[in-house]
Amino acid sequence: MVSVKRNYNSVIFEVKGWDKVFAFKSSLEIPVEHIVAVYAAPNIEMNFLDSIKLLGTSIPKVFRAGTFYQHNEIIFWDVHNTENVIVIELKHEHFKKLVVEVENPAEAIAIIKG
């Protein structure tokens, strides 16, 4: 799970608990101008064969955390419960997308959109 905070001109995604270990990342700070879109994606698929794990942990259809190469893009995942997933599309960043589980998707989207 990830918590979302907004500073003046950036959004901080802080990875919680053991997911820091599984994802090999504790936080990401993204400038607001690099965020192209943000939307809820409940019940997103976590198929085993749709990506290549670059650095992270994955149990097919159960848990995915870390950096994955998927559909010709580098994507950061941190998802256990697919019901609370949001997707953040980015430009000018290492990651093309962040696919993360949050406590409250509507609230997280509102924070990101400012």
Residue ranges and their predicted role:
Residues 1-9:
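Polybasic, low-complexity association/targeting segments
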Residues 6, 23-29, 36-114:
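Acidic, Ser/Thr- and proline-rich intrinsically disordered linker/docking segments
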Residues 12-30:
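Short aromatic-glycine motifs in intrinsically disordered, low-complexity regions
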